[in-house]
Each structure stands twice: as C-alpha cells, then as structure tokens.
C-alpha cells in the first residue's frame, strides 16, 4: 500500500532535491584537493632526490637552502595562482631568497601554498557551475511551495542569470575557496616536515601526505552540503522578494538527526529583512538540512485545511495543526512518544 502524502515528506523531498547535487560537488572538491596534494608530493619527492635527503639527517636537509630547480618550480606554479594572490606570494619568495632564508623547510611550506592556490580557479568554476543549478532550482521550488500553500497558481518568470550569479557569489567566492584550502596548506606542510623529522624514508613521507585525502573527502562532503543548503536558502529569499513575501517560517526536518537548535527554531516566524544565516535562517551549521517556507497571511491560512503527517511506525496518516512543530512531532511521533508505540528510526545506527 502506497504511503499517503505527508507534510514533512514534501520538505524532505525538497531538501533531497538540493542535496542530490552534494555528491557531484563533494567529488569535485575531493578531486581538486587531491590534485593539490599530489602536486605537493611530487614536488617534495623531487626536492628530496636532488638534495640527497636519504644520505643525511633530516634536520640538515630541512635547514639547507632550496636549490634553483625548486625556485623554478615555484615560478611555474605561481602562474596558475589567481592574480589577486600572486604578487603577495612572489614578494614573499623573492624576499626569502634575497635574505638567504629560503631553506628547504620554508620551500616546503611555500610549495604547499602554491599547489593549493593553483587549483583555486578550478574550484571556483566547478562550484559555481553546480551552485548555479541549485540556485535556479531553489528559486522555482520556493515559488512552487508558495503557490501550493496559497492554493493559487501564476506564471513564473525565469530568474535572471545576473541574480543567479549574485546568489552564487554570496555563498562561495574566491575568498571562500581560499578559506577552504588554507587549512590544507598548513596541514600538508606540517605533515611533510614532521614526517621528515621522524626520519621516515621518502616513500613513507609521501604516504603520510597521501593519507590526508581521506580527511579531505569527509570535509568536502560537509562543505558541499553546507554551501548547497545556503544557496537554496538564498534562492528562496530571492523568490520571497520577487513575490512580496515579508515573513518566512523556519522549517526543520522531522527525524532523530535534527539538532536541538534547529528543532527549537522549527515553525518560528521571522521577518524576511532580518534573516541571518546561522542565526534564524539555514544553514544553521555544517550539514544542516533545514529550509524555509513563506509565511501566509493569517486570514488566508485560517481558511486552509490542516496538514497531514504519516506516522512511519504505524502507517496511519493524521491531520495535524499548521503550527505543529518539531517539539510536537518529537513528543507525538518521534523518539519521545509515550503512546506505547516504538519509534521507527529513519537512520540505522553505525557500529
């Protein structure tokens, strides 16, 4: 027997639609960061071979001066760095050379930065391409939910490309791409240097950096979900402005993974012009799955039918008040229910 339509199912489908872009974006971020890591590994191995790292104590190698081939490699990498960062990095390189401070340890740190910054343009282009589709989807879905809530339909104008770009830039621009990569600069260079100081051979030094890819895969998933949620939220806001919506209702997903902060905000009404991401507008935190719906005029809302919710534990569909929130769900259908029926989790616990 097919499950009856349910209010929160609509919300979950909306969020799932946006998050369908999460895997492609996360994979793209992982691919790009892996390229930076592989570049650093290759550059460091070349340095170690030229400097005969295996034939001397690591401290002596690290404090030795970087050779001309390393400097030439830095110049080549610098060409791929976004122009806004190029001059500052080059001044740092030439300053260290002029003052005889370009040791191998400093060269490793500089190569880590150059390899990470050399992929920023690719990261920005790839992310913008995916988020543009999320922004368009979010605009139309925000409008569709408004039509569904009011029971009225109208022709929807296409969102202009310039507005899409504004939305995307507000969520993820070049400084955001740099913010994403900067921890990798520090982490990867420290990993290389510490591995050398421990006396590891070149192969093990390379593997220690390669192991960072696993941590970055997790981070890429979190970043992808967060920026997608924020993009969809900004697109909803664009739809609200377009159609004269002055207030919105914060809407959380009803399941056991919803955090207490989002649960408390569920159903609360906020003025559109006072929306603040992370305060009263999603995403509230990394991996946030919340969204918003337009606040309908109270007189119109009073004429509308109640919402329906299907209890997963019993399969029974109930009519619920339109102001039924996460706390009500938690106590009535969720883990806090006291009617003798066991709550049916939506997610399996990991061992």
Identify what each model region corresponds to:
Residues 1-209, 299-351:
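N-terminal leader/targeting and assembly helices and adjacent pre-domain segments
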Residues 207-311:
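Acidic, glycine-rich two-metal-ion catalytic cores of nucleic acid-processing enzymes
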């Amino acid at each position: 027997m097919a499950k009856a339509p349910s209010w929160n199912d609509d919300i979950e489908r909306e969020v799932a639609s946006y998050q369908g872009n999460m895997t492609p974006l996360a994979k793209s971020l992982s691919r790009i960061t892996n390229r930076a890591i592989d570049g650093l590994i290759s550059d460091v191995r070349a340095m170690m071979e030229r400097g005969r790292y295996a034939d001397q104590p690591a401290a002596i190698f690290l404090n030795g001066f970087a050779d001309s081939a390393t400097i030439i490699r830095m110049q080549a990498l610098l060409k791929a760095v976004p122009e806004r960062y190029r001059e500052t990095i080059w001044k740092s390189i030439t300053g260290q050379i002029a003052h005889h401070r370009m040791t191998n340890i400093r060269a490793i740190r500089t190569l880590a930065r150059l390899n990470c910054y050399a992929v920023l343009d690719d990261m920005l282009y790839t992310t913008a391409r995916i988020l543009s589709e999320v922004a368009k989807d979010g605009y139309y879905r925000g409008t569709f939910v408004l039509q569904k809530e009011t029971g009225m339909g109208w022709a929807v104008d296409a969102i202009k490309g310039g507005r899409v770009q504004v939305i995307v830039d507000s969520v993820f621009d070049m400084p955001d791409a740099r913010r994403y990569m900067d921890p990798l600069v520090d982490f990867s260079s420290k990993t290389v240097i510490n591995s050398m100081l421990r006396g590891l051979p070149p192969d093990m030094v390379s593997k220690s950096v390669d192991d960072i890819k696993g941590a970055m895969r997790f981070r890429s998933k979190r970043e992808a979900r967060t920026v997608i949620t924020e993009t969809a939220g900004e697109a909803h806001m664009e739809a609200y402005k377009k159609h004269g919506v002055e207030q919105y209702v914060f809407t959380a997903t009803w399941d056991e993974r919803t955090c207490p902060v989002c649960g408390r905000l569920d159903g609360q009404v906020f003025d559109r012009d006072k929306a603040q991401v992370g305060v009263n507008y999603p995403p509230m935190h990394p991996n946030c799955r919340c969204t918003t719906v337009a606040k309908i005029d109270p007189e119109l809302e009073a004429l509308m039918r109640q919402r329906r919710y299907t209890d997963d534990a019993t399969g029974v569909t109930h009519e619920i008040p339109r102001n039924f929130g996460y706390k009500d769900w938690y106590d009535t259908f969720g883990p806090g229910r006291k009617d003798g029926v066991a709550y049916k989790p939506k997610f399996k616990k990991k061992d």
